[in-house]
Amino acid sequence: MTHWFHRNPLKATAPVSFNYYGMITGPPASKICNDLRSARTRLLELFTDLSCNPETMKNAADLYFSLLQGFINSVGDSTQESKLRYIQNFKWTDTLQGHVPSAQQDAVFELISMGFNVALWYTKYASRLAGKENITEDEAKEVHRSLKIAAGIFKHLKESHIPKLLTPAEKGRDLEARLIDAYIIQCQAEAQEVTIARAIELKHAPGLIAALAYDTASFYQKADHTLSSLEPAHSAKWRKYLHLKMCFYTAYAYCYHGQTLLASDKCGEAIRSLQEAEKLYAEAEALCKEYGETKGPGPTAKPSGHLFFRKLGSLVKNTLDKCQRENGFIYFQKIPTEAPQLELKANYGLVEPVPFEFPPMSAHWTPEALAAFDLTKRPKDDSVKPKPEEDVKPVKEPDIRPQKDTGCSVS
């Protein structure tokens, strides 16, 4: 289902030449710098290459990160800092902040920022794959796994590398806790959407589907709350998406909970549960329109136009009609004024991030290679840093045209 997921733009970066004239005193260092330059260029190109798959991305990312490790950790002792950590200035934009970049003279900042973009690529790959016509079961599994991988990368950056930065992230920037938490939670929620779609397709028990939907809605609510203290100019569009998904999956939870109640001969409560689903579905429809009219980063998803979205509206209406008929002929139960409390706990299908680690240092980093970088020969004017306020050219992302909606239930 194309354009079902909201995606913020990729981070853009200034070119890095890895040219250290005068400092390089031997072929091993020269080769490493050449390899770094080509590996970085290749990885940046793959972010917008529609033919790129997870295997290609992993290989390219591992190559670059393994080479970059020599600028972060000392050769032969990963607990010691490399003498090269602070020799290069890196500039990266942020997903919500337009073209004005952040800049730090720190290889750890480069590792985190490029890793962040790799995670974003996995989310965009998942969205693109989910938008294919006639998506297969294996492709649905790949969507699910890609979102879990992305969550794992974001989580690893947050826990293991962002704390190492000497300059803390500014408020509203990608490496700030609120934003990276929102990305982690959104990835988990979207992966669970795939689980829900699968459970519906296989006609699992309504109680399980209701619990999964409720848990997913809670994820979206948590992500929205995480962003609530950000500047609305930057976060309003993203938050509208999170809010509409929260309403949509809460409606799903009430709909399937109503089916569970009806099966237990609690027809009056079932009607009230489905009335709540009907109200929340209408709210989600209204939020879809508001989301489409809200300005902000990223292309606009169009969830209300999808059969998966519309199917819920039909399901709620038909199930509510059935319950009302049954109550009029068989049960004659009073309909509660308050909607039932959803105290649902899913025991299956819950999504956890796939654990992630950066690759070990490249074998090209030997004591001889490190010694071939002579910092005493660093040019005196090398301390002149690029101005961080200079704009960085945005990434030109490919336009993903919506394909025919077949009603495939992989959301």
Swiss-Prot record:
Residue(s) carrying Cysteine methyl ester: 408
Membrane topology of this protein: Lipid-anchor
Sequence ranges of Basic and acidic residues compositional bias: 375-404
Pro-sequence residue ranges: 409-411
Residue ranges, annotated region (Disordered): 375-411
BRO1 domain sequence ranges: 90-408
Main localisation: nucleus
Lipid-linked residues (S-farnesyl cysteine): 408
Domain of life: Eukaryota
GO cellular component, one term: nuclear membrane
Keywords of this entry: Lipoprotein, Membrane, Methylation, Nucleus, Prenylation
Modifications made to the protein after synthesis: Farnesylation is required for nuclear envelope localization.
GO BP terms, alphabetized: mitotic nuclear membrane reassembly
Localization per Swiss-Prot or TrEMBL: Nucleus membrane
Subunit structure and binding partners: Monomer. Interacts with CHMP4B. Interacts with CHMP5: this interaction allows the recruitment of BROX to cellular membranes. Interacts with SYN2; this interaction promotes SYN2 ubiquitination and facilitates the relaxation of mechanical stress imposed by compressive actin fibers at the rupture site.
Functional summary from the UniProt entry: Nuclear envelope-associated factor that is involved in the nuclear envelope ruptures during interphase (NERDI) repair, where it is locally recruited by CHMP5 and reduces cytoskeletal stress through its action on SYN2 to help reseal the ruptured membrane.
Similarity comment: Belongs to the BROX family.
Protein name: BRO1 domain-containing protein BROX
Annotated organism of origin: Mus musculus
Gene: Brox
